[in-house]
Design a protein with these regions (language model features):
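Mature, well-folded catalytic/scaffold domains that follow N-terminal targeting or propeptide regions
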Residues: 1-175
Length: 175
């Protein structure tokens, strides 16, 4: 159901016509337990495909409220996908800056670095994909200094101790 809701969130970006009020209204019709994944999908669609101006993206971030780490995680995934495709565009930069407070390159680096750390944190029954998403949200929430912890093309992973500390903090019940 979670992956379905992430896809549904992506579709809301298009169906809602890039209108934050329409998108928020649609999300509020769903049970609270599904909203995190919906916001994640919206963050990915907004950042990957664009279509919104800075005011609309800011309003979307504001409207996400307590779900902001999820919309930010979606933006990080979008930056990672654009980076891997060698196809960074201005809308990806805009989405990353406004939804998660990172440049598109920092977000792409975060996406790659946290993926490398999944083996250090996936000691639960949680699927690796969900551990990866959780790590991204944790880094965003902690406001790690990416210039020190995630150097561009460093070829090295974040220290396992840092990943474990981040996961310990992220294990606190998420909204």
């Amino acid at each position: 159901m979670r992956a379905f809701d992430q896809g549904l969130g992506r579709s809301l970006w298009f169906v809602g016509g890039v209108d934050p009020e329409c998108i928020t209204s649609a999300i509020l019709r769903f049970p609270k337990s599904r909203r995190n994944d919906l916001w994640s999908g919206i963050g990915l669609a907004c950042t990957y495909t664009g279509g919104g101006d800075s005011g609309e993206v800011r309003e979307l971030r504001r409207a996400s409220g307590a779900h902001w780490p999820h919309i930010a995680q979606g933006a990080v995934f979008a930056a990672g996908a654009r980076h891997r495709a060698g196809n960074m565009v201005s809308q990806t930069e805009l989405g990353c800056q406004l939804l998660c407070g990172l440049s598109a390159q920092q977000a792409a680096d975060l996406c790659e670095e946290t993926l490398r750390d999944v083996p250090y944190v996936s000691e639960t029954t949680e699927p690796d994909y969900e551990a990866w998403r959780r790590l991204i949200r944790a880094y965003i929430q902690l406001g790690e200094d990416l210039s020190e912890n995630l150097p561009v093309n460093s070829g090295r992973s974040v220290q396992p101790q840092v990943a474990q500390r981040t996961v310990a903090l992220s294990n606190r019940k998420e909204a």
